[in-house]
């Protein structure tokens, strides 16, 4: 079998001659491959044995030999690329092709559905791995979506209309202002085999009391089998949605004893985790799922950090049969990138500094400094939601004279954060301000556990927005620390549905604590033979409802 090295050398010859027959000499070919005449003769013999080309040598000084290509170099390159992809070896793939843009297209062309022994498989390309899939811990946008595929909660939130629906509980009722009752389905099983018990539900809900949004849960009991009572310390009109939010997923009560649970979680959802490594997340349809069995048998999400700068964070690449990926769906996100000025900073605690930064670092100014690659995906934001226009259009103010150094903090494994921070640095440098870029892990960022003048942040909201917007921001310790406010008054108003969210958000923008930057276009790319794909506000879709039309694609 020809070696990969020989394949690569043939591809270089084929590219040099553009696949056309040529009259040439050993020396000319040796120059192309940067080797000796003796070695090129050996290579040509091996390529000829492999059936890739025909070499008709002519002897005599000045005579030129005939080179005919029998194999298409592009096809051979695609074959080698697929071998490297199967090995998750993108680094060698980049070396093979020599251009990351080309590699990106090649990779996307290989992400296709496959039918193995009657199984319907979907492959997805993503820019980073998912080491933490534990509900109740700090989760990023994509992890929140995946948690919903692996776990269930008492209720679930309809992604389209934002209404609470039956999930583990088939009915529920509010018995009093502080007492709710949920009626659970029988015969529900976890992925590792055992049946769901009421003790699992009680342990999961009591575990949540350490989280700010769930701190008002006073106790959880089961008066009779398959009935759960939740008692609150204060009324919460949002409880039926709160119990269906990503943090409130039900775990087996022994979850802490299960090996590597955060990476290999066990739930009751439509998909179970089979493998979760630095290269790939593999989830398989759970045949004992209590609801409709998923139509896609297996989903493999490949992680390609080597191509991170060529993959937009909010574009999800599904299977595709060509390099020209069809856009299955696209939308502007509910949420945005924004800057948070830190109340703990002696510099950004000052109104004049915050106001100057907001006048300088406008969305339009940042877009003018970014690559066209990102301009296509970013839209100026003037409020946390697309329909809000809270940022005031003010002329650029004079820099406070004592400001010469600033620090911005962002979380790692997010190349668009890195890109935005580089733009911020370039703009501030022109103003005579040195910007230090501090990159931390996600937990440190989420909790605001480091010193910084301001932070680069993002928030993605889901339906209903009047629930998720405050819930998402309130459960982010970083926001409270930057505002210097524990929001205890606001959360009580919100639970009673008496808080005007738009007025509250406008206030923190007006005071220049929060500065909106960009809304992001979310996009799904793949074959149109895929059905049942409805993009949610996180840019993903419900795997269990998707299917392939075998007569198309």
UniProtKB/Swiss-Prot annotation:
UniProt-listed Pfam families: SBP_bac_5 (PF00496), SgrR_N (PF12793)
Region described as Solute-binding: spans on this chain: 163-494
Q: Which GO terms describe its molecular function?
A: DNA binding; peptide transmembrane transporter activity
Please name the InterPro entries in this protein's record: SBP_5 (IPR039424), SBP_5_dom (IPR000914), SgrR_HTH_N (IPR025370), Tscrpt_reg_SgrR (IPR023767), WH_DNA-bd_sf (IPR036390)
Per UniProt, residues of the HTH marR-type domain are 1-117
Q: Please tell me whether the keyword Acetylation is annotated for this protein.
A: no
User: Would the keyword Repressor be found if you checked this record's keyword annotation?
Assistant: yes
Which keywords fit this entry according to its UniProt record? Activator, DNA-binding, Repressor, Transcription, Transcription regulation
Q: Name one GO biological process term.
A: negative regulation of DNA-templated transcription
By its UniProt entry, which CDD domains does this protein fall under?
A: PBP2_SgrR_like
DNA-binding region of this protein = 26-49
Q: What does this protein do?
A: Activates the small RNA gene sgrS under glucose-phosphate stress conditions as well as yfdZ. Represses its own transcription under both stress and non-stress conditions. Might act as a sensor of the intracellular accumulation of phosphoglucose by binding these molecules in its C-terminal solute-binding domain.
Protein name per Swiss-Prot or TrEMBL: HTH-type transcriptional regulator SgrR
Q: Which gene encodes it?
A: sgrR
């Amino acid at each position: 079998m020809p070696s990969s090295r020989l394949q690569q050398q043939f591809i270089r010859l084929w590219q040099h001659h553009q696949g056309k027959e040529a009259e040439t000499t050993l020396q000319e070919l040796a120059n192309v491959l940067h080797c000796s005449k003796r070695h090129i003769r050996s290579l040509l013999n091996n390529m000829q044995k492999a059936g890739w080309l025909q070499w008709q040598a002519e002897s005599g000084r000045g005579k030129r030999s005939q080179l005919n290509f029998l194999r298409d170099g592009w096809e051979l390159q695609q074959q080698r690329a697929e071998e490297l992809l199967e090995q998750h070896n993108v680094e060698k793939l980049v070396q093979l092709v020599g251009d990351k843009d080309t590699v990106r297209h090649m990779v996307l062309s290989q992400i296709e559905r496959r039918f193995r022994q009657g199984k319907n498989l979907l492959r997805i390309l993503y820019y980073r791995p998912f080491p933490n899939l534990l509900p109740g811990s700090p989760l990023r946008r994509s992890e929140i979506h995946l948690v919903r595929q692996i776990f269930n909660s008492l209720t679930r939130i309809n992604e389209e209309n934002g209404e609470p629906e039956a999930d583990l509980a088939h009915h529920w009722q509010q018995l009093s202002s502080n007492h709710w009752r949920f009626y659970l389905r029988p015969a529900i099983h976890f992925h590792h085999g055992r049946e769901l018990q009421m003790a699992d539900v009680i342990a999961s809900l009591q575990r949540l009391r350490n989280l700010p949004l769930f701190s008002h849960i006073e106790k959880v009991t089961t008066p009779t089998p398959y009935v759960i009572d939740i008692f609150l310390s204060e009324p919460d009109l949002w409880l039926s949605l709160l119990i269906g939010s990503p943090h409130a997923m039900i775990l087996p009560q022994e979850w802490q004893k299960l090996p590597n649970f955060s990476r290999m979680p066990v739930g009751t959802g439509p998909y179970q985790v089979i493998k979760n490594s630095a290269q790939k997340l593999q989830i398989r349809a759970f045949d004992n799922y209590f609801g409709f069995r998923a139509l896609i048998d297996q989903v493999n999400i490949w992680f390609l950090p080597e191509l991170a700068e060529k993959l937009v964070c909010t574009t999800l690449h599904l299977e595709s049969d060509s390099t020209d990926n069809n856009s299955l769906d696209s939308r502007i996100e509910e949420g945005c990138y924004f800057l948070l000025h830190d109340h703990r900073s002696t510099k950004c605690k000052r109104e004049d500094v915050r106001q100057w930064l907001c006048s300088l670092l406008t969305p339009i100014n940042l877009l003018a400094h970014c690559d066209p690659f990102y301009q296509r995906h970013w839209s100026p934001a003037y409020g946390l939601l697309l329909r809000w226009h809270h940022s005031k259009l003010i002329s650029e103010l004079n820099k406070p004279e004592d400001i010469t150094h600033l620090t911005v903090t962002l979380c790692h494994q997010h190349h668009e954060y890195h890109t935005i921070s580089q733009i911020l640095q370039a703009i501030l440098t022109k103003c005579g301000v040195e910007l230090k870029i501090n990159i931390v892990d996600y937990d440190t960022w989420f909790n605001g556990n480091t010193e910084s003048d301001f932070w680069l942040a993002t928030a993605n909201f889901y339906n209903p927005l009047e629930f998720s917007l405050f819930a998402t921001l309130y459960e982010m310790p970083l926001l409270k620390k930057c505002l210097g406010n524990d929001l205890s008054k606001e959360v009580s108003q919100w639970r009673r549905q008496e808080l005007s969210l738009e007025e509250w958000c406008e206030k923190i923008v007006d005071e220049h604590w929060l500065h909106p930057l960009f809304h992001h276009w979310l996009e799904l790319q793949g074959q149109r033979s895929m059905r049942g794909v409805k993009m949610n506000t996180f840019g993903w879709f419900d795997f269990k409802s998707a299917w392939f039309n075998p007569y198309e694609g």
